[in-house]
Amino acid sequence: MGANTFGKLLAVTTFGESHGPAIGCVIDGCPPGLELAAEEFAHDLQRRATGRSRHTSARREADEVEILSGVYEGRTTGTPIALLIRNTDQRSKDYATIVRQFRPGHADYTYWQKYGIRDPRGGGRSSARETTMRVTAGVVAKKWLKQRYGVIVRGFLSQLGEIRPEGFAWDAIEDNPFFWPHAAQVPALEAYMDALRKSGNSVGARVGVVAEGVPPGWGEPIYGKLDGELAAALMSINAVKGVEIGAGFGSAVQKGTEHRDLMTPLGFLSNHAGGIIGGIATGQPIIVSIALKPTSSLRLPGETVDVDGCAVQVITKGRHDPCVGIRAPPIAEAMVALVLMDQALRHRAQCGDVGEMSPCIPEGVGLRNADD
């Protein structure tokens, strides 16, 4: 299996399966001198973890990070950082009935067609368990970005089924299990998810990520576009079926006079571009959004085929999320941060000595944003 590494100057490789003995990652290219301790990973891993809410999978993993290399006396050395998390709460017997069946909407069929073999236990390599290591690597990237450039990357749930936020406050997001930006709606979300779980069905969601403080100039034209690499990174997350940058697909119905982000000495008057023009950061907040499909792991019967091509009925047992989007904000944050750190290192390598050619336009006066 190839394509387990992404990034150029900052390269991240993940390994391991959902029900294997461990999962891990190697971060290559992190500059030396960054203070790093194993306990720093706990916060974001808890945010991503299952079993902390009745609205997510009941699987409970300790997610304790072991730093195997790349850190000496509490600081990164510039050599590859190897991180390991041991799996402790696998329940492989739940998957005994689907060893020879293909679950509709899962990677069972495509992995079988590509490799001629698959690990049916929890989805193996295709499981969202792999994203644990993305979040772990993202902790390193977010810390480096904040310390070096003051960049802050934050995510939130922007839609659950047909429900959208009726207000927005960053302070509310970490105070509920949905990463929801409007506290008054949380009881309604709880009731919605309780009913969904009882029905045995699942639902999709949208997640938004905002990166603030990104300097103008990060990114590359044509084949190394910042928005292109963000889109690729976010599309690599399990269940993601769409990515928007700024106004995204809403741009299709806008007039040019609506979409263009006018500039004044005080800053940009809007941010429909989502902070990126020509593949290069403008200095405004970078705004991205992803759509996640409903999980196909359902206890409702459905038609499928087995490895012999025979028609069968499938019912997925085990512990599964009724909405995978609920745990996705920390994962999306991590992918955005890793792309930004890689782009920052590449920009510094090529254009670190380039001075300002013209006055740098401030972020803007906040009259309009990509969601208007």
UniProtKB/Swiss-Prot annotation:
Reduced FMN (FMNH(2)). It comes from the Bacteria. Its cofactor is FMNH2. CDD domains: Chorismate_synthase. FMN binds at R125, S126, S127, N238, A239, G278, K293, P294, T295, S296, S297, R319. One of its GO terms (molecular function) is chorismate synthase activity. NADP(+) binds at R48, R54. GO terms for cellular component: cytosol. It catalyses: 5-O-(1-carboxyvinyl)-3-phosphoshikimate = chorismate + phosphate. Pathway: Metabolic intermediate biosynthesis; chorismate biosynthesis; chorismate from D-erythrose 4-phosphate and phosphoenolpyruvate: step 7/7. NCBIfam families: aroC, PRK05382.1. This reaction introduces a second double bond into the aromatic ring system. PANTHER family: CHORISMATE SYNTHASE. This is Chorismate synthase. It comes from Xylella fastidiosa (strain M12).
